[in-house]
A protein has these predicted regions:
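N-terminal hydrophobic or amphipathic helices and topogenic motifs
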Residues: 1-68, 111-113
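Early extracytoplasmic/lumenal segment of secretory-pathway proteins
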Residues: 66-77
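Pocket-lining segment of extracytoplasmic ligand-binding domains
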Residues: 95-96, 104-105, 167-225
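A structural signal for short loop-to-beta-strand junctions that line the ligand-binding cleft
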Residues: 108-120
Length: 225
């Protein structure tokens, strides 16, 4: 291992030959960075990271355009990263996340600070619960995982339960750990927001005694969905 820094940081005199080499290095660095775009994707297990990776493969053009997919906390944190994190130029997120940042977080001039580029496949929200829980209303007072903080499910799930007036004990647990806790009975349900193709649900054994709950549409969240 080694700790390295630019010689400029130490104020050392640089020989002329090294200065010329440094000039060449600087031009290479400038060219490489001129058309490099950082895309905030999401969690490694999520569909948004898959989108970012596919964009990188499809748009790659060497030094003319290089797309770098970035692993992040998820769709809800991606707008924060786009606004404030160095190296993030593009973010994959959801329309409800944007509306939340604009209307609830009241981020100043958000509609002019970020711009819509392209529509991606629609995300679908799923609530996976034990078989003895028949409806979403049965989760009142129960422990529900909304996925990791910053993930799209953490925001969308919270909005849905709040608007329906169903109070639950909210937990923010990684999806794979959440599934294990659901099967062991430590939690009662989990919220997962994904876009196709994701094989998370198809890999759950048929004898796991779990099922998906219906989410009734309500005018209470019609302003978002």
């Amino acid at each position: 291992s080694a700790l390295m820094a630019s010689p400029h940081a130490f104020g050392q005199a640089i020989p002329q030959a090294l200065q010329q080499q440094g000039s060449t290095e600087a031009s290479i660095k400038e060219k490489r960075n001129a058309w490099t775009v950082g895309v905030a994707g999401g969690l490694m297990s999520g569909s948004y990271m898959t989108f970012a990776d596919e964009l990188a493969k499809a748009l790659d053009d060497g030094d003319n355009l290089r797309v770098l997919p970035l692993v992040t906390y998820g769709a809800a944190s991606n707008i924060d990263d786009l606004l404030y994190l160095r190296g993030v130029d593009v973010a994959v997120t959801q329309s409800d996340v944007f509306e939340y940042f604009k209307n609830e977080r009241k981020i100043w001039n958000l509609q002019n600070r970020v711009h819509y580029i392209i529509r991606l496949p629609v995300s679908e929200v799923h609530i996976l619960a034990r078989r003895d829980i028949r409806t979403i209303e049965d989760l009142r007072g129960k422990k529900v995982s909304f996925g990791p903080a910053g993930a799209g499910s953490s925001l969308t799930g919270t909005l849905i339960f709040q608007r329906l007036g169903i109070q639950v004990e909210q937990a923010n647990i990684d999806t794979s750990q959440g599934l294990a806790k659901l099967r062991s009975g430590e939690i009662d349900a989990l919220v997962r927001l994904v876009s196709k193709p994701i094989d998370f649900f198809s890999k759950i054994p048929a004898d796991a005694n779990l099922h998906l709950l219906s989410i009734p549409f309500s005018k209470k969240f019609a302003d978002y969905y």
